[in-house]
């Protein structure tokens, strides 16, 4: 969804710096007007700090890196738990902590975090580490929002339902019966279909724009009714 977000922000006239651990994932964005691309490992604190120092003034920070671990607690080794929280939560902490002073010095800004419908509001089988980490993102979002609201910093998170992304495609392909697996993902959506990444990206645009200027500390569910 980071790809769709970068394109949506650029269409609105933003100067976007898109980052990814895998430079190949950035190739399709390189020629897009308004987007520059940087390879970044958000689990490397030194690399994150160097990136923030080189980024210049920033008005919007979108924390989007994430990983979906599948399994129950008995199928979730400590290393799986730690990796899920490191990528899904700690990376947000490190990048936000490095970027926030620049935003405050610049008079304010907007931080948007990627959460999930699976988290504080809803559970699903075999998603222990993922759901727990995404619930933590919601808590992080609210705590950050209340701490810095007086400094003109707005912080919200988006909680999508099941989105048709390359990541989902990879997970579906790993099932013994990928066709049935896709049907199962569709069937858990009350609307009877998966979301397009571009649909979710429209909510990103709203939440970082002046149209949402009176919103902070909110979890916005764009889930096709999955949380009902």
Provide a role label for each language-model segment.
Residues 1-15:
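Canonical Rossmann dinucleotide-binding motif of NAD(H)/NADP(H)-dependent dehydrogenases/reductases
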Residues 101, 146-150, 213:
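Alpha-helical segment proximal to the catalytic Tyr-Lys
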Residues 160-170:
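Short, flexible catalytic-loop segment of classical short-chain dehydrogenase/reductase
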Residues 93, 193-222, 227:
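C-terminal substrate-recognition "lid" of short-chain dehydrogenase/reductases
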Residues 96, 133, 141:
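Active-site helix of classical SDR
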Residues 72-73, 80-85, 185:
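Substrate-binding pocket helix/loop in short-chain dehydrogenase/reductase
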Residues 116:
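Residue(s) in the substrate-gating loop at a strand-loop-helix junction
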